Amino acid sequence: MKPYRDYYFLKAKHEKYPARSIYKLKEIDNRFCLFQKGMSVLDLGASPGSWSLGAAEKVGKTGRVVSCDIQTITIPLPSNVSFFQEDIFHRSDSFNNILIKEGPFHVIMSDMAPQTTGVKITDHSRSLELCLEALAIAKCYLLQQGSFIVKIFMGADTIELVKEMRQHFERVTSFKPCSSRTKSKEIFYVGLGFKRFTTS
């Protein structure tokens, strides 16, 4: 195991987070200043729960986090986090109603990743599909001037995601956190200044 993997794994364990991904979110927020007290956040692909915990800390008791994943979350969650076990491609009517009731959200974030095959083209294609679905949800439930975070496995069609995001955000920036593994193909795109009433 490489030293940097040891560091973030042990740091997460020591600070009682379920995964090292918490530090990716912290780095993203340090760079872009996305969260404030009292905000509402939607966390897509939330399991095992690190991003929901991180967002809950940032928005405080007056804020709220709605999180969902096809897999369950087993860790205790604070009172300002509501978790729903949902497939975002086949959302139940009850969950859609919750999104309508709780939204629009100040921040929508997706750390979703597909089941990897080891075939880069396949993994990239599946990752892009998740990203575009997350963006479709953001277009429905993100607040005017809100922010969007999405992870993708890099590949030839990443530009498709970027082009789509640029139609709906004033600024779109790529970011690779230091806490990402050096050889990882993952990169995050951050959309700032959502233009809610843009048509495409």
From Swiss-Prot:
Cellular component GO terms, alphabetical: cytoplasm
Cross-referenced Pfam families: FtsJ
Entry keywords, A to Z: Cytoplasm, Methyltransferase, rRNA processing, S-adenosyl-L-methionine, Transferase
Residues annotated to bind S-adenosyl-L-methionine: 49, 51, 69, 87, 111
EC number: 2.1.1.166
Function: Specifically methylates the uridine in position 2552 of 23S rRNA at the 2'-O position of the ribose in the fully assembled 50S ribosomal subunit.
Family of this protein: Belongs to the class I-like SAM-binding methyltransferase superfamily. RNA methyltransferase RlmE family.
Full protein name: Ribosomal RNA large subunit methyltransferase E
Lineage: Bacteria, Pseudomonadati, Thermodesulfobacteriota, Desulfovibrionia, Desulfovibrionales
